[in-house]
Amino acid sequence: MDNLTYEKRLISKAARSHTPINGSFELLPLCNMNCGMCYVRLSRPEMDLQGHLHSAAEWISLARQMQKSGTLFLLLTGGEPLLFPDFKTLYLELRSMGMILTINTNGTLIDETWADFFAQYPPRRINITLYGTSKETYRDLCHYEDGFEKALRGIRLLRERNVDVKINGSLVRSNSTDVDSLVALARSLDAPINIDTYMYPARRERSAAFCEQSRLLPEDAARGKVQFEKASLDSKTYLQMAQTIITRVSETPDTPEPDFQRMRCQAGRTSFTIN
């Protein structure tokens, strides 16, 4: 039985007992990049108007309560979590509690010191989002021209130390032509990749017309998803997947939606987020 199967069994058991096994700490809204589609990021002045960061001690206190309640899997995210003061102190304390840690980061801050730290105290996985495969895309979308080379360097430093890395992508107007090159890059780095095509409305774009937002039109998002599947799967697997979807759609009766459907999402059942 592989680790993923064990995890699914644990989550299934947690759902039956209403155990909060899976948590997420959104440590801060601050980030060294400024992506157009981001719905989390605040500048320091914007954050100060709304509140302040929790201290490492406050997060640790919360984590102890979570540990007693059965939390095992914990995601550390942001903003950019590596900007959080005392990140290493918090990380090591969470690790000592037996929590299985995953980190979401843009990867641009990872240097030899960070890479050595994660090699010595490895997380379950570090998810690094690549927003494109060129400095031009990072300049236009993230307003950080050096971001691509820095993120790429961070991934390589981690992989050289055998730290588990997964590459995530966020498909928007500015990088919609980068799907194939992102998949090829992930292969060259020996890292799995997933590209999300649905973006939440960005706080700064909510008053703009849809055509002026970073998000793709639904039809374009669907095309991007198909393009990603086609680029990342071998032809036989892709055709099997496509046929399965076609069969499922063609055999689904055209009936009205029921008044109530059981919620499949685990939010509030086995998972939660604290910011």
Task: Locate predicted features.
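Conserved alpha-helical substructure of the radical SAM core
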Residues: 1-116, 120-125, 224
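Radical SAM enzyme [4Fe-4S]-AdoMet core and its adjacent flexible, acidic
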Residues: 131, 136-267, 271
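A structural signal for isolated positions on well-ordered beta-strands in alpha/beta enzyme cores
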Residues: 75, 102, 127, 166-168, ...
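Generic short beta-strand
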Residues: 99, 271-272
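Generic anion/oxyanion-binding catalytic loop in active/binding sites
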Residues: 48-51, 127, 140, 168
